[in-house]
């Protein structure tokens, strides 16, 4: 599904955000990417989403390598939900936010309407279609931001701190929504209870390196969590 091999990312100022990192995401896997602030989680997601180009190493999804020539094709297979929902909600109405990517691809408006309606229904937010994001709660914004990504039919979903800005009720709705989505997921999070509810694999990152990779039992080790600032 998604294979990362010997990935390294060094920023212009010399910061080594990702350091020779390798792992694979399987078809039925939901990975919680955990680590203290500055560990490299967001940098990794940005590289996997094709937003920034790694210094070296390789990324492959469904047999397709991330190269400049194929980058647009690759990006269609990766859905990236940013930490701040407002980064993906900038149109007058939620309907237009969700339709935005489809329109950029030149899809027929009738087809777009069907896709938007089905996507919003899948997340139980059809009632938000004709509303502005400026009038939505944090939880509603989060669901709408996910819808903008789902409408593009990605193969893999990436999330950067999806529970940020959410109250307990909104978190419960998010857990239910993510568990209903069959897409493999990589979720960067500091929210351990949330991780146990939506993920079946844990990767601990520190200084851009994978320190631990295993099942949910990793989250029961107080010594491990303390060691890596979690």
Please give the residue ranges for each predicted region.
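Helix-to-loop junction immediately C-terminal to a conserved catalytic motif
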Residues: 49
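Conserved ABC transporter NBD signature motif
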Residues: 57-66, 74
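Conserved ABC ATPase "signature" region
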Residues: 110-128
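Conserved ABC ATPase signature
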Residues: 132-136, 140
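Catalytic Walker B motif of ABC-type/P-loop ATPase nucleotide-binding domains
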Residues: 157-160
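H-loop/switch region of ABC-family ATPase nucleotide-binding domains
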Residues: 189-190
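Conserved beta-strand-loop-alpha-helix hinge in the C-terminal portion
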Residues: 209-230
């Amino acid at each position: 599904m998604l294979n990362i091999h010997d990935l390294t990312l060094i920023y212009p100022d010399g910061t080594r955000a990702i350091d020779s990192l390798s792992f694979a995401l399987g078809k039925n896997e939901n990975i919680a990417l955990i680590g203290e602030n500055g560990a490299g989680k967001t940098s990794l997601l940005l590289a996997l989403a094709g937003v920034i180009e790694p210094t070296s190493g390789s990324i492959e999804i469904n047999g397709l390598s991330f190269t400049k020539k194929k980058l647009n094709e690759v990006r269609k297979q990766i859905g990236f939900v940013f930490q701040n929902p407002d980064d993906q909600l900038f149109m007058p109405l939620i309907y237009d936010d969700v339709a935005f990517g489809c329109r950029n691809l030149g899809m027929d408006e009738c087809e777009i309407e069907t896709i938007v309606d089905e996507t919003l229904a899948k997340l139980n937010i059809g009632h938000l279609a004709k509303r502005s994001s400026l009038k939505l709660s944090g939880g509603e914004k989060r669901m709408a931001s996910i819808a903008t990504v789902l409408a593009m039919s990605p193969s893999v979903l990436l999330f950067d701190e999806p529970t940020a800005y959410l109250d307990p009720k909104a978190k419960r709705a998010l857990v239910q929504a993510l568990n209903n989505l069959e897409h493999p997921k990589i979720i960067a999070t500091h929210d351990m209870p949330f991780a146990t509810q939506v993920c079946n694999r844990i990767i601990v990152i520190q200084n851009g390196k994978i320190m631990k990779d295993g099942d949910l039992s990793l989250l029961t080790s107080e010594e491990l969590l303390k060691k890596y600032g979690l």
